[in-house]
A protein has these predicted regions:
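Substrate-binding pocket helix/loop in short-chain dehydrogenase/reductase
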Residues: 97-99, 103-108, 207
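Conserved glycine-rich Rossmann-like NAD(P)H-binding loop of the short-chain dehydrogenase/reductase
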Residues: 28-44
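Alpha-helical segment proximal to the catalytic Tyr-Lys
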Residues: 127, 170-174, 235
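Conserved glycine-rich cofactor-binding loop
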Residues: 7, 14-16
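Active-site helix of classical SDR
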Residues: 122, 157, 165
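Residue(s) in the substrate-gating loop at a strand-loop-helix junction
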Residues: 141
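C-terminal helical subdomain
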Residues: 181, 201-237, 242-246, 272-290
Length: 290
């Protein structure tokens, strides 16, 4: 159990990658504080963990608000006495429009959720992480490396997190605190599959052909990398961007079209996930199709 006796805060823990990371960390021995917006099924995830014998505390609030972020950190320390790991996973992908048509309110929501939340949680958690020589993990994106047409603010927000993670890693190294960023490609969640999301059905159909491995990733595959980076096995890893994207970042053309059908299947889920495709609930996605 790589995370035995460690305490982790996971933001955006109600659905998708956050839900999978919560279950993976508990399976590896961690005790967790699961944070999410009031409409997110965070309490349900905590109840499933508790039913399986794990320890989880649910915290509901808008972590882009200073008071809520501070209170989340305080709740973790009050419940478990310390913090070893912070997973800055919360974020939104809420609009599909060329930059001249991108609504200012969607831009501001993206900045608040994706940047401000991560900054505030990092700020308030660091004094506790310095005591435990803990580590911080961020959910970045391949879009933050390559850029993304029609989602320019989203890609830019992830690019900020990449640079922020590196800066925190350099700054906090003398405290023994590590910081790393995982950069997923297209993952099988509500953001990339089904109606009502930011991707058109045409783009959704082409994803598997654009990814060299010929398929979307699963939330569990991202959680597996988070678990390694959070563990002492990664003690010499800091300031790193970990691409977990099926090869889409260096790819050109439709490399995935050559992958045989049997390799296109997403691996079977081993974690008790119930909300992998619920991430859009209450997020008010805006599409400006042309």
């Amino acid at each position: 159990m790589r995370l035995k006796d460690k305490v982790a805060i996971i933001t955006g823990a109600g659905t998708g990658i956050g839900e999978a990371t919560a279950h993976k960390f508990v399976r590896e021995g961690a005790r967790v504080v699961l944070a999410g917006l009031p409409d997110d099924p965070v309490k349900d995830v905590a109840e499933v963990i508790a039913a399986g014998g794990g320890e989880a505390e649910a915290y509901l609030g808008d972590l882009s608000e200073e008071a809520a972020a501070r209170a989340c950190v305080e709740a973790a320390v009050r419940r478990f006495g310390k913090i070893d790991v912070l997973v800055n996973n919360a974020g939104v992908f809420i609009a599909n429009a060329e930059t001249q048509d991108y609504r200012v309110e969607d831009f501001e929501r993206t900045i608040r959720c994706n940047l401000r939340t991560a900054f505030l949680m990092t700020k308030f958690a660091l004094p506790h992480l310095q005591k435990t020589r803990g580590n911080i993990l961020f959910t970045g994106s391949e879009a933050g490396i390559s850029g993304s047409a029609r989602f320019t603010p989203y890609g830019a927000s992830k690019g900020f997190l990449h640079a922020f993670a590196k800066g925190v890693a350099l700054e906090q190294a003398h405290y023994g605190v590590r910081a790393n960023c995982v950069c997923p490609g297209p993952i099988d969640t509500a953001w990339t599959r089904g109606p009502g999301g930011p991707l058109s059905l045409e783009i959704q159909k082409s994803i598997d052909q654009m990814v060299p491995l010929g398929r979307r990733g699963s939330p569990e595959e991202i959680a597996n990398v988070f678990a390694f980076l959070a563990s002492d096995e990664a003690s010499y890893v800091t300031g790193a961007l970990w691409l977990v994207d099926g090869g889409v970042t260096p790819a050109k053309g439709m490399a995935g079209a050559m992958v045989p059908e049997e390799l296109r299947r997403i691996p079977a889920v081993t974690l008790p996930l119930r909300h992998a495709h619920d991430g859009l609930r209450g997020k008010h996605v805006h599409l400006a199709e042309k």
